[in-house]
Amino acid sequence: MDSLTAANNKFCFDFFREISKDDAHKNIFVCPLSLSAAFGMVRLGARGDSAHQIDEALHFNELSKDEHKEPNDPSPQSESKASDSSLEGQKQTSASQDQQGESTNDHQLLGCHFGKLLSRIDRDKSYYTLSMANRLYGEQEFPICSEYSDDVTEFFHTTVESVDFQKDSEKSRQEINFWVESQSQGKIKELFGKEAIDNSTVLVLVNAVYFKAKWEREFNSENTVDASFCLNENEKKTVKMMNQKGKFRIGFIDELQAQILEMKYAMGKLSMLVLLPSCSEDNVNSLQELEKKINHEKLLAWSSSENLSEKPVAISFPQFNLEDSYDLKSILQDMGIKDVFDETKADLTGISKSPNLYLSKIVHKTFVEVDEMGTQAAAASGVVAAEKALPSWVEFNANHPFLFFIRHNPTQSLLFCGRVYCP
C-alpha cells in the first residue's frame, strides 16, 4: 500500500502544478486520490501505449509487486508508525523500481493495490463522510467485458453503466447528473451541462467528490469576527475569521520562511495541513515560491514528528467555501495521457473488445466548505470573547494566501489539496 500512496501523492503535486501554472490568482480545490482511482479504473482496461502513458503520468509504474500480497489489515502498532515510517517506505519504493520495469505489466496488480487502499479508507468513514463518485458510462453499442465490470466492482467499489448516448444523449446526461447529485448529498449539481454530452459521446468518466468532517477541536463561533485578508500589497478582502487557542502540532520551514500547522478532524483519522508563507509585500510570489518547491517527499519531511511539535498556538483561520469544476482532457493530455482520448489510437480493449472505444470526456468537480465545526456545518459569527492571560502563544494568522492538504493519517494518503487565494 505504501507504494500506491507514494504514487498517488506524487501525482497530486504534478496535477496541482499543471492546473495552477497559468493563474496564481485563483482558488484551487481538487481530490487527486479520487482522480487517481478514476484513472485506475481506466488503466484496468487499457492496453499498449494507452496503458503505458497512464502508468507514467500517474506513477503507477512505481508500484511494488509484493505489497498486494501483504495482509489487508495493518496492526494498530503499524498504523501509529505510519507517518514516521513513510520516508523510509519511499526509499524502499524507489529502490525497487528498477526491478519492476517501465510499466505495470499485470493490470490487476493496480486493482489489488487500490482495493486495499480504498477499503482501508472506507473503514474509517464512521468518523467522516467521503463520497468519491467515480463511474464509467459507456455507449451501449460497446458491450462491456464482464471480467472488467467485475474487477471494477471488486477493486474500485463502483460500477460501469451502459447508456444510449447515440439515440438519447440528453436522457443519459440527466441520468449521470442525477447520480452525481445523489452521491454528493445534493451539493454537486449539473456535472455535465447541456452541451457537454451529445450523440458522438462513447465513454465518459465521472469524477465528483463530497467531503464532510468535524474538527477535533472546534472553533467557538462567538470568536469569529470580520477581519482583513490580504490578497496582495494593494488589495484586501473582509472575511469571517475564526479564532481559537490550544495545543496543536506546528513547525517552521526555514528554506521557505513558512509555517506548517496540523489541525486534526474528529478522532484524528484525518488532518488538514496548512502551509502559510510569511506575510510579505507580495503574498502571491511567496506562495508561488512554495508551490514550486513543494513535492511529495518534502511534505512528508515537513509534516513529520521531526519538524512538527505540539505547542500552544493562537490560530486565526478564515471560513471559506470552494467549488470548482475541471475539464481534464487537455490537462491530462499535457501530462502525457494522450492516446485514450484519441479515437484512432486508444486501446481500451480490456473494457470492451471493440477497437473503436475511446474516452470522450472526463470532468472533475469538487466542493468544500470550512467553518467553525469543520466542513459542511452551519456557519455562525458573533462577538469576540475575552481571553484570559495565558502562556506565550505561537501565532498562526492565515490572513493571506495559503496552501492546504487534507490527509488520511493511517495511510498518509493526500485526499485533497487546495490553494486559498481569496476566501
Curated annotation (Swiss-Prot):
Task: Please report the name of this protein according to its UniProt entry.
Answer: Serpin B12
Q: Does the keyword Cell membrane apply?
A: no
Positions of the UniProt region annotated as Disordered? 63-106
Query: One GO BP annotation here?
Result: hematopoietic progenitor cell differentiation
Record's subcellular location: Cytoplasm
What SMART domains does its record include? SERPIN (SM00093)
Name of the coding gene: Serpinb12
Question: According to the UniProt entry, which residue ranges have a biased composition of type Polar residues?
Answer: 75-106
> Which species?
Mus musculus
* Function, in words: Inhibits trypsin and plasmin, but not thrombin, coagulation factor Xa, or urokinase-type plasminogen activator. May play a role in cell differentiation.
Q: Which family does it belong to?
A: Belongs to the serpin family. Ov-serpin subfamily.
State whether keyword Aminoacyl-tRNA synthetase applies: no
Q: Which UniProt keywords apply?
A: Cytoplasm, Protease inhibitor, Serine protease inhibitor
* Entry GO terms, CC: cornified envelope; cytoplasm; extracellular space
